[in-house]
């Protein structure tokens, strides 16, 4: 392209600078809103939550969160789901999101921290004991079965990532 005047060259240069500046603005990253600290996980006004504790057959205390629909009918028995978190995680991450969504859909849901992780008992912290992890699912079924509003014959499991394998192992060991 042949430019015939310095004016056209200046205009072209100005347009090039403007387009680069606009492009850089489109890629600007905005920091997350941390005004509420790190507790920025999804919550629903349609769901009630309660921290619960129960023991597995090894006598270890397992800590979980029970999710129930706010509009539960007195005397009715509800289908329930146990939600296991991904390996090396805690319930406040993916498991609570799944449990909240299930409670919004009308299920009673229970997420829990595997032994050695989060708020559940066990040392050394972060230990990997698949038999204990599978037992925690069985203990969660037993715990939910004691709730008057849960249909003991209709308790299912959602195992996220590695918890899927532990849930399958639990059904094999404790059908």
Residue ranges, per PLM feature:
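Alpha/beta-hydrolase active-site loop
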Residues: 127-148
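Short glycine-enriched nucleophile-adjacent loop
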Residues: 164-175
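Conserved alpha/beta-hydrolase
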Residues: 101-121
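Short beta-strand element of the alpha/beta-hydrolase
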Residues: 75-86
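Bacterial N-terminal signal peptides
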Residues: 13-24
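The serine-hydrolase catalytic nucleophile loop
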Residues: 88-100, 114
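N-terminal cap/lid segment of alpha/beta-hydrolase-fold proteins
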Residues: 33-76
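Alpha/beta-hydrolase fold nucleophile elbow
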Residues: 149-161
């Amino acid at each position: 392209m042949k430019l015939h005047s310095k004016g056209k060259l200046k205009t072209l240069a100005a347009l090039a600078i403007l387009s680069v500046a606009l492009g850089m603005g489109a890629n600007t990253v905005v920091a997350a809103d941390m005004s509420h600290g790190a507790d920025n996980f999804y919550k629903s006004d349609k769901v009630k939550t309660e921290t619960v504790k129960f023991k597995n057959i090894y006598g270890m205390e397992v800590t979980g969160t029970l999710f129930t629909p706010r509009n539960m009918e007195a005397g009715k028995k509800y289908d329930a789901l146990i939600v296991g978190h991904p390996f090396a995680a805690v319930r406040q991450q993916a498991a609570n999101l799944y449990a909240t969504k299930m409670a919004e859909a009308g299920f009673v849901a229970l997420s829990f921290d595997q032994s050695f992780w989060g708020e559940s008992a066990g040392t050394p912290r972060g230990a990997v004991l698949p038999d204990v992890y599978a037992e925690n699912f069985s203990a969660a079924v037993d715990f939910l079965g004691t709730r008057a509003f849960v249909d003991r014959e209709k308790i299912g499991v959602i195992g996220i990532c590695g918890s899927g394998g532990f849930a399958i192992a639990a059904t094999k060991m404790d059908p």
